[in-house]
């Protein structure tokens, strides 16, 4: 079984029956959309695709870095960790540290995050949350998008699909009265 298939199966097991709090879909459906988007960008690297399946697993389950390292190797585990919040820190510092991690993360991590943001914002549009709550969630996702944007812009010619995802995000957010992300 491939590492990607193992990661997908692991996610199915760990997220069994869980629904995302910001949308009325399962974690598995969201992660399927993230991985599909990544493949649409032309990503074929096994470690990157496995990490995309596992990107939220440290944040939302009792899965540890060591367990990921043991099951999927250090490359996947480090990539997942770069997209995870450090729950041992106080809440106020957690967010600051997370933003720093995103800024310093690899292009692969930033591409996964872009696909995560794209899927999350699309799902928010159809979410049962109030308009005010949707806008609040969108603003948070847009903040993360702006953090990773410089590296995405640098690589938009090599990975042309990046601009399409940003345009898709802009389509949704402007319908909520938010300013579009400038991507040039």
Regions found by a protein language model. Give the residues of each.
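Active-site helical microenvironments for divalent-metal-assisted chemistry
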Residues: 1-184
């Amino acid at each position: 079984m491939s590492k990607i298939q193992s990661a997908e199966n692991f996610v199915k097991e760990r997220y069994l029956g869980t629904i995302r709090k910001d949308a009325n879909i399962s974690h598995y459906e969201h992660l399927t959309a993230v991985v599909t988007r990544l493949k649409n960008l032309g990503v074929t690297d096994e470690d990157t695709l496995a990490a995309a399946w596992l990107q939220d697993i440290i944040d939302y389950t009792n899965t540890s870095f060591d367990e990921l390292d043991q099951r999927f190797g250090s490359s996947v585990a480090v990539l997942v960790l770069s997209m995870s919040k450090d729950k041992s820190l106080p809440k106020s510092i957690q967010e600051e540290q997370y933003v720093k991690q995103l800024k310093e993360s690899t292009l692969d991590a930033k591409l996964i995050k872009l696909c995560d943001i794209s899927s999350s914002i699309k799902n928010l549009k159809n979410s049962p949350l109030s308009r005010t709550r949707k806008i609040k969630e969108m603003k948070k996702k847009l903040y993360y998008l702006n953090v990773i944007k410089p590296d995405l812009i640098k690589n938009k010619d090599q990975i042309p699909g990046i601009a399409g995802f940003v345009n898709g995000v802009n389509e949704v957010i402007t319908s909520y009265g938010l300013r579009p992300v400038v991507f040039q």
